[in-house]
Amino acid sequence: MPPYRSRTTTHGRNMAGARGLWRATGMKDEDFGKPIIAVVNSFTQFVPGHVHLKDLGQLVAREIESAGGVAKEFNTIAVDDGIAMGHDGMLYSLPSRELIADSVEYMVNAHCADAMVCISNCDKITPGMLMAALRLNIPVVFVSGGPMEAGKVVWEDSVKKLDLVDAMVAAADDHYTDEQVKAIERSACPTCGSCSGMFTANSMNCLTEALGLSLPGNGSTLATHADRKRLFVEAGHLIVDLARRYYEQDDESVLPRSIATFSAFENAMTLDIAMGGSTNTVLHLLAAAQEAEIDFTMADIDRLSRRVPVLCKVAPAVSSVHMEDVHHAGGIMGILGQLDNAGLLTTSIPTVHSETLAKALDHWDVTRTNSEMVHKFYSAAPGGVPTQVAFSQERRFDKVDTDREKGVIHSKEHAFSQDGGLAVLYGNLAEDGCIVKTAGVDDSILKFSGPARIFESQDSAVLGILNGKIKPGDIVLIRYEGPRGGPGMQEMLYPTSYLKSKGLGKACALITDGRFSGGSSGLSIGHVSPEAAEGGTIGLVREGDIIDIDIPNRKIHLAVDDATLAERRAEQDAAGWKPAEERKRKISTALKAYAAMATSAARGAVRKLPD
């Protein structure tokens, strides 16, 4: 049996000094020999998705100790992508994922913790902790802070649901008065929690359920609802049980790499495609798979995207549906249940809470079970009161939405589309692939052809859109915004939001080697690989070049002959692969270090040491 890692610091005469320090943290004689569980929190007052986490780490810690473990809490950083958006702060967002993963590794290995409970929530925090968990491969349970309630505003004599993107779009739309914009701003983000749509944060928290590393309801139970407290309480007890099973019973099946297998990654990606998750999830799943030493690639995502239908449409794809509505329809277990019915999942694999996913679905899918407890759990409703306090309300819907024909979650037979919600496109513009969230693309522009309007940065693209330089039929092309070129692979939420505000959301396309917020919609194609900074064809496109986009056939093509491209490549090799116009960006040493090691989006933008 593997020895408890913590005994490296708690046992033996030579560890008297270390034990003295442990005692100074509150440990007593009877604690030495118990599993030491790291409570990996991410509380910060900068981020609404994390502002309520301050006391939740200690809630988990108390449950760990009541179950016979020793809990030690520490914090990671957490960047709010919405606040960092639209300025140089966004350069730090993706690199923060690596810092989070490293900080968890540093703390857990330096102090020889035996297991972890990861309390995450927003965009890069869940992926960073997931990467660390698979890197360390010690028992882990994920429990996130939960989604915020959707905003609501009275608009033209009716109540309209809102989220962060609505505020951005309205602010750039001259049809809205200052007073109307202010009303939307004040109502868009009413509570603590991750932004209310199927954006990156919620997408990733949902995927932890499919990977088998979190409890049912983790992705959809509102941050404000009292039911969410149960997830934290159960996580504290569960992690002690998992630690004992591994260290005392030699049960390797509880380890994250035994749970998050290739099949689990397929399940997670299948879920992502079916629910129209954020394109950022592709980046993060690829990165996590590499940490787990799993050969899960863009080719696998492409394969899955061709057979998985869209079973759930959530904001930004449908403005009236938010995470509270997904939960009301049975949450992630409800979507997984329909995917299983369609034969699209591997359900023989384990989870942290169940012997197999199949058994979990039998208990937790509201269309399969008559359990009063399960139906009550998924009837949790928004409270409708602005608050930053977790578990502060107990409102419920009268009954759960089990309509799989016209409800929030559809069966395969009644799918929104038999073609998946995410697609990988290939062609001479993206030899290693690029990603589009098809769930947010209008059917009328699934095939699109137009002239490229070149911008060497997100900033110049924003100015071009706001100043009326983009016309219907144009393709906005933003380059040198990839992992190396940015550096940091900025999100392009402002350009997509501004196109929408100008009435161009269904009349233009946007292509970039950067990435998109989970709040982006429209014909937005990102993660173009190779990126411009590493010699990708996107760096050879010139103003007015025609680009053909064919989503049904998964193709993207720059209509320039090979000989001309070869000439341009020779010229660019001589000039250097850098933006044609100077950018006023302060690139710190930290960002330069990230850029020096960053790989392409097709590899998850993970770091790779130079040969």
UniProtKB/Swiss-Prot annotation:
User: Membrane-spanning regions, if any?
Assistant: none
Q: Which residues form a coiled coil?
A: none
Q: Where does Mg(2+) bind?
A: D81, D123, K124, E491
Reaction(s) catalysed by this chain, per the record, are: (2R)-2,3-dihydroxy-3-methylbutanoate = 3-methyl-2-oxobutanoate + H2O; (2R,3R)-2,3-dihydroxy-3-methylpentanoate = (S)-3-methyl-2-oxopentanoate + H2O
Q: Which residues carry this modification: N6-carboxylysine?
A: K124
Q: Name one Pfam family in it.
A: ILV_EDD_C
Q: Which GO terms describe its cellular component?
A: cytosol
Superkingdom: Bacteria
Extract the InterPro entries matched here: Dihydro-acid_dehy_C, DihydroxyA_deHydtase, DiOHA_6PGluconate_deHydtase_CS, ILV_EDD_C, ILV_EDD_N, IlvD/EDD_N
| Presence of keyword Amino-acid biosynthesis | yes
| Cofactors (names) | [2Fe-2S] cluster; Mg(2+)
Q: What class of enzyme is it?
A: lyase
Which GO molecular function entries does the Swiss-Prot or TrEMBL record give? 2 iron, 2 sulfur cluster binding; dihydroxy-acid dehydratase activity; magnesium ion binding
Q: How is the cofactor bound?
A: Binds 1 [2Fe-2S] cluster per subunit. This cluster acts as a Lewis acid cofactor.
**UniProt entry tagged with the keyword Zinc-finger:** no
Annotated [2Fe-2S] cluster binding lies at: C122, C195
Q: What pathway does the annotation place this protein in?
A: Amino-acid biosynthesis; L-isoleucine biosynthesis; L-isoleucine from 2-oxobutanoate: step 3/4; Amino-acid biosynthesis; L-valine biosynthesis; L-valine from pyruvate: step 3/4
User: Which PROSITE patterns would you find in this protein's record?
Assistant: ILVD_EDD_1, ILVD_EDD_2
Q: Which family does it belong to?
A: Belongs to the IlvD/Edd family.
Subunit annotation: Homodimer.
Q: What does this protein do?
A: Functions in the biosynthesis of branched-chain amino acids. Catalyzes the dehydration of (2R,3R)-2,3-dihydroxy-3-methylpentanoate (2,3-dihydroxy-3-methylvalerate) into 2-oxo-3-methylpentanoate (2-oxo-3-methylvalerate) and of (2R)-2,3-dihydroxy-3-methylbutanoate (2,3-dihydroxyisovalerate) into 2-oxo-3-methylbutanoate (2-oxoisovalerate), the penultimate precursor to L-isoleucine and L-valine, respectively.
What is the designated name of this protein? Dihydroxy-acid dehydratase
Q: What is the species listed in this Swiss-Prot or TrEMBL entry?
A: Brucella melitensis biotype 1 (strain ATCC 23456 / CCUG 17765 / NCTC 10094 / 16M)
